[in-house]
Swiss-Prot record:
Function, in words: Essential subunit of the gamma-secretase complex, an endoprotease complex that catalyzes the intramembrane cleavage of integral membrane proteins such as Notch (glp-1 or lin-12). It may represent a stabilizing cofactor for the presenilin homodimer that promotes the formation of a stable complex.
Tissue specificity: Expressed from 100-cell stage in most somatic tissues, including neurons, muscle, intestine and developing vulva. Little or not expressed in early embryos.
Keywords: Endoplasmic reticulum, Golgi apparatus, Membrane, Notch signaling pathway, Transmembrane, Transmembrane helix
Assembly information from the UniProt record: Component of the gamma-secretase complex, a complex probably composed of the presenilin homodimer (sel-12, hop-1 or spe-4), nicastrin (aph-2), aph-1 and pen-2.
UniProt name for this protein: Gamma-secretase subunit pen-2
Subcellular location: Endoplasmic reticulum membrane; Golgi apparatus membrane
GO cellular component: endoplasmic reticulum membrane; gamma-secretase complex; Golgi membrane; membrane
Keyword set includes Membrane: yes
Transmembrane segments: 18-38, 58-78
Superkingdom field: Eukaryota
Amino acid sequence: MDISKLTDVKKVDLCKKYFLIGACFLPLVWIVNTFWFFSDAFCKPINAHRRQIRKYVIASIVGSIFWIIVLSAWEIFFQHYRAQGLVWTDFLTFVFPTGRV
């Protein structure tokens, strides 16, 4: 999809839709939103529509960073306790070590 051919109003609408879709626990959509609209939000001269795009891009960046931190912390926490051989970690995994099943 070539977003350079869209009008500013349609860009704002598309950026808003991607932000709302990302708010449904889909952080990868926020990352796509950031990459697609970053140049419109920060590299081109500012106007009323680009100000709205900038708002959604900044919110997408903040949301993506939040989810990356949360998922990384969970992975570190889980792997740390799984290496200790605690029983509850086996209930949270789909991949069982050899000899455990």
